[in-house]
């Protein structure tokens, strides 16, 4: 029996929500291990739509333990709002079903303000952040001045911790021409939110270790995509955390031996939100058609996603950096009806072939994709639940992707409906 890590194999928005929901039925515990509330996802269960950003997907299924690990940065005000919202939809969320790592870093209002100011300022590089304070909170974590969940339990020690945070932030704000943060006001806000958050706090690494030893199945739910990883993504157009599968261990407190099967999620084409390189981006009617059919707008932000052909070079790269065992290929039905489909199989850089995306930002801007043209199919794949339901050419497309990325397709999704899934290999049965 394997524990399973789910990671996005592109730039996020690959359809992880549906796959995680499908897998969570077989899991006992669902763990978020990185990021914050910057990456939303939608679940449709028994006709009811749930929109989550910070809460693990398991929270909407009864009998599951949901865990927010130490690798996540937690906006406590957003978390309570999200809990109340899904409670209003009839979902039971209590300390018996949700635990939060006591050593998780908190996102403070000053982090959101700084994020917004940086991104909207005329000077400097625009990264395309969601302006929710994720990056500044991680900066404080690495700078060893963060306020963590556990600190809320010691109100007498909070003033000194706030002073340490504000020594840095108020100096920065003065330099940026922003009003300084009032220490008493921040202390009051934290004291007010503490009793709502602390009942969920736990020593998560110990809890997960005990459950693992008891034979419980653990599903590690990644957010965003590996191409946004702060180390292995298209830097600096990345998020502020590690996203690759190894982070599941670091961000939950379990050793790497607890990770079993790594399932990467990839669309049958490619999308990206925000700034940054995108070698296969389409600026024509085909790109518009893909975006319209695929409803390519952000769950949290409503931002329009950039669309392009499937980039086998990039997915092959994430297969390697995340140690992906198998891929869940989603949105195959969006490609129905195209006479021909292109797949990027390599790059040219200054007239020379390259088999990966270089780390240099300047080199990334000069990359030219090399395409293989594959005949399309006129029949529909929407709603297919077996190989027999698929057009022959669609099967050839999937098989060619497997060859190019160096990993098998374990699951194939043919619509947003959770049952419209073709299973080749169950990750939990490794």
From Swiss-Prot:
Note on how the cofactor is bound: Binds 1 Mg(2+) ion per subunit.
UniProt-listed SUPFAM superfamilies: P-loop containing nucleoside triphosphate hydrolases
Record: active site: 13, 41
Record-linked InterPro entries: Adenylosuccin_syn_GTP-bd, Adenylosuccin_syn_Lys_AS, Adenylosuccinate_synth_dom1, Adenylosuccinate_synth_dom2, Adenylosuccinate_synth_dom3, Adenylosuccinate_synthetase, P-loop_NTPase
Positions with a binding annotation for Mg(2+): 13, 40
GO molecular function, one term: magnesium ion binding
UniProt superkingdom: Bacteria
Residues annotated for GTP binding in this entry: 12-18, 40-42, 305, 331-333, 413-415
Gene Ontology process terms (BP): 'de novo' AMP biosynthetic process; IMP metabolic process
E.C. code: 6.3.4.4
Catalysed reaction, written as an equation: IMP + L-aspartate + GTP = N(6)-(1,2-dicarboxyethyl)-AMP + GDP + phosphate + 2 H(+)
Catalytic class of the enzyme: ligase
Function: Plays an important role in the de novo pathway of purine nucleotide biosynthesis. Catalyzes the first committed step in the biosynthesis of AMP from IMP.
Protein name: Adenylosuccinate synthetase
Annotated organism of origin: Methylobacterium radiotolerans (strain ATCC 27329 / DSM 1819 / JCM 2831 / NBRC 15690 / NCIMB 10815 / 0-1)
